[in-house]
Amino acid sequence: MEEITQHFGVGASSHGHGHGQHHHHHHHHHPWASSLSAVVAPLPPQPPSAGLPLTLNTVAATGNSGGSGNPVLQLANGGGLLDACVKAKEPSSSSPYAGDVEAIKAKIISHPHYYSLLTAYLECNKVGAPPEVSARLTEIAQEVEARQRTALGGLAAATEPELDQFMEAYHEMLVKFREELTRPLQEAMEFMRRVESQLNSLSISGRSLRNILSSGSSEEDQEGSGGETELPEVDAHGVDQELKHHLLKKYSGYLSSLKQELSKKKKKGKLPKEARQQLLSWWDQHYKWPYPSETQKVALAESTGLDLKQINNWFINQRKRHWKPSEEMHHLMMDGYHTTNAFYMDGHFINDGGLYRLG
């Protein structure tokens, strides 16, 4: 802000950095350039200036409280924007430029960029405004443009480079200011749209809870009044099916991974009851020698729904905990050691190294 102000030859404020210190700059500068800092500050109500060369009575009284004192709507008699352009601070009566205010306003109004400046100013005031207010501001800009064209006619404005630069710089500031105002509003709207989308994804069959509740209460009222008009009923089964389908579609990946994880944990724990019953039945029938062949293991796996690893682990644990060779089997094994140190029994080869199955 200060860089732009200094660019147009405007010095420091009459109030210095310390109390009681005053700095006066006598180099040449233009009064309108000192108002750059006023664009982002609230504008105080300005009294109408009598006898202006061009009066812009473009704002009618509104229903808002203090409408005539609202700087946003103070465009009549060159208020609001013009005062911001002319006065960054209230000029004192002793100011050598106080008498030039009307001439400065006339130059600003007659400048070719005035309508662009006014449009940018009104765009700032449209941010967050209700639709009716935004529409009214657009009408104001159109009315001002029409009045400006009528008042100026075909007259060419006098060329004044420093005023041209000021109008361009002021317009650029207003555009940037509008962007700064719009950004948080857009972020808030985007956040609300995401929340609304998430809530809609959880709604049932696209109907809001309010509609469902209102339908239910209407049915109760109709039944209590004895009327015969049939109201639409909520198909609970259909709603449940649609909700189930929606949830399965949304969480199918998560459920699949969870199912696999539970399946792994299930394999590490106890076997299903029916599978255990079938294995115990086979165990009872072959208690004397509970060593199933590979063919028998495959058959047991198919009938129980278990895999071969589970079958093998079950028999190993079962033999360790619940089986000991009978006396007859023990004597046969011992006799085998004394003769050939090995013998065959039920297709098994037994020696001092343990039990082995042939082929």
Curated annotation (Swiss-Prot):
Residues 242-262 form the ELK domain. Transmembrane segments: none annotated. One of its GO terms (molecular function) is DNA-binding transcription factor activity, RNA polymerase II-specific. Keywords: Cell junction, Cytoplasm, DNA-binding, Homeobox, Nucleus, RNA-binding, Transcription, Transcription regulation. GO terms for biological process: anther dehiscence; negative regulation of auxin mediated signaling pathway; negative regulation of DNA-templated transcription; plasmodesmata-mediated intercellular transport. Residues 1-34, 213-232 are annotated as: Disordered. Expressed in apical meristems of vegetative and floral stems as well as in the underlying ground meristem. Specifically expressed in vascular bundles developing both in the leaf and stem. Very low levels of expression in leaves. The keyword Lipoprotein does not apply. Residues 16-31 have a biased composition (Basic residues). It is found in: Nucleus; Cell junction, Plasmodesma; Cytoplasm. One of its GO terms (cellular component) is microtubule cytoskeleton. Residues 263-326 bind DNA. Disulfide bonds: none annotated. Belongs to the TALE/KNOX homeobox family. PANTHER family: HOMEOBOX PROTEIN TRANSCRIPTION FACTORS. Binds to RNA. Possible transcription factor that regulates genes involved in development. Mutations in KN-1 alter leaf development. Foci of cells along the lateral vein do not differentiate properly but continue to divide, forming knots. May participate in the switch from indeterminate to determinate cell fates. Probably binds to the DNA sequence 5'-TGAC-3'. Forms homodimers. Binds to MBP2C; this interaction reduces RNA binding capacity. This is Homeotic protein knotted-1. It comes from Zea mays. The gene is KN-1.
